[in-house]
């Protein structure tokens, strides 16, 4: 594995363990030249999964596209890179389990929104505002009302649980 700092092509594995998603191996490596430590992830190569875009074109599924959208939405929020990596792994696993060769971009976008709603409401709103292409404030207000109702429902059920 090539070192990201000095580009030397030999490194040794210092630590290796299964990642939280269960489908990935996380390896800590150390460059044999400059001794920089870096992390790599190893996962099973899957058959190509095609994403059907809204205009009907098809392109290969890309974790990086989801990553870029989520990272941008999570800027300055208390969302760790591990949280984001796990979120993307869950989405990919759901898609690969439910769809054999092709999936619509709408399905992927909705899965991202479901996961973000559980992770961080502000990140969810930021992602939704781009993904849903809101046309006016009424649409944003409706989304915020849905989130408020969901949060109130969670608080009410946790209060009910404490009463027992």
UniProtKB/Swiss-Prot annotation:
One GO MF term on file is:
DNA binding
Q: By which gene is this protein encoded?
A: nrdR
Lineage, top-rank taxon, reads: Bacteria
Kindly list the biological process annotations in GO that this record carries: negative regulation of DNA-templated transcription
Q: Which HAMAP family match?
A: NrdR (MF_00440)
Sequence similarity: Belongs to the NrdR family.
Alphabetized, the UniProt keywords read: ATP-binding, DNA-binding, Metal-binding, Nucleotide-binding, Repressor, Transcription, Transcription regulation, Zinc, Zinc-finger
| Protein name (record) | Transcriptional repressor NrdR
Which cofactors does it use? Zn(2+)
In what residue span(s) does the ATP-cone domain sit?
A: 49-139
């Amino acid at each position: 594995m090539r070192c990201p700092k000095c580009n030397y092509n030999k490194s040794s594995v210092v630590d290796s363990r299964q990642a939280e998603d269960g489908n990935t191996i996380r390896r800590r490596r150390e460059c044999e030249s400059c001794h920089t430590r870096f992390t790599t992830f190893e996962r099973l190569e899957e058959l190509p999964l095609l994403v059907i875009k809204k205009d009907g074109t098809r392109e290969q599924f890309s974790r990086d596209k989801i990553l870029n959208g989520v990272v941008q939405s999570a800027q300055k929020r208390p969302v760790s890179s591990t949280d984001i990596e796990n979120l993307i792994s869950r989405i990919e696993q759901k898609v690969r389990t439910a769809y054999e060769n092709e999936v619509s971009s709408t399905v992927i976008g909705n899965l991202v929104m479901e996961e973000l709603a559980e992770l961080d409401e502000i990140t969810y709103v930021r992602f939704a505002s781009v993904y849903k292409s809101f046309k006016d404030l009424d649409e944003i207000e409706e989304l915020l009302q849905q989130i408020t109702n969901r949060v109130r429902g969670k608080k009410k059920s946790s209060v009910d649980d404490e009463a027992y």
